Amino acid sequence: ERGRTEIDIPSVYTRDGRTGNRPTENRLTENTPTGNERTNSPTGNERTGNGRRSYLPAIEVEFEPELTGYYWKRSGMLNIQTKRGCPYECIYCSYPHIDGQCVRTMDPEIIAENILRAKRDYGINYLFFTDSVFNIRPEYNVRLAETLIRRGTNVAWGAYFSPRGIDAEQMRLFRASGLTHIEFGTESFCDRTLEAYGKRFTFGDVVRASRLALDNGVYYAHFLILGGYGDTREHVRETIENSRRLEYTVMFPYAGMRIYPHTRLAELAAREGVVAPDDDLLAPAYYIAPDFDLEEARS
């Protein structure tokens, strides 16, 4: 039976990460506005050092020495953020709630310095920028790419991109700075479904962005959500048909949408009776459109 999930967690501390190295207890006793800092005691009493009044204008970044070698040795890649926050309103996504909708960027010089240090100390040659969407704040992205080139990082990188908000000049610059592959959070190749999902681009944007990647020798993939809110059999057929217009790509299709708290999808799912309004959603719950047929999509 779904509902409230009982878990035993003695305390919770949340804040805008990478705000420095002062101990947690100092941040709670000093009233410095570094973001959302909160503890919940076992008795249920909440102690707030700083309510989230605003977000940091910039985020610090540094590879943790004790973890860098471990992850590089076992995975062959490292991850790093260049910005935090997402201004988009995709109905299923929890990033705007977790990271905020205010975009905060990291100093390109510090990013380059960390990459060079990791390359020198561990021999890394590939990393992934884990921004929710890389190609927002285009002026910043240009500055970052130019910094990577100027500092001679010479490390291949990939990132999550939106199909909208990238032009030929930027793609060439990113490629010169080390971009080797893109993962597009496309979700559908049908404009009607894209609108239902809260996307701000069209299939025409998808075709153009894919062509830009192909023309610049950048590998690219598209993630797809079939049977999400507003999707139908007809829309799925259109997505499958349109997929044939994209060349030399990889597609990752998923069936249904995971319902996360504080999203538009959670509100819609509760309204339709898919989940209860007070469901904490810690146990996974999924929305699958009534008109979606998984077996038909597979065939």
Where are these regions (language model features)?
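Radical SAM [4Fe-4S] cluster-binding motif and immediate context
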Residues: 57, 61-221, 226, 241
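Flexible glycine/acidic-rich beta-alpha junction loops that bind and position SAM and/or redox cofactors
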Residues: 88, 139, 192, 196-197, ...
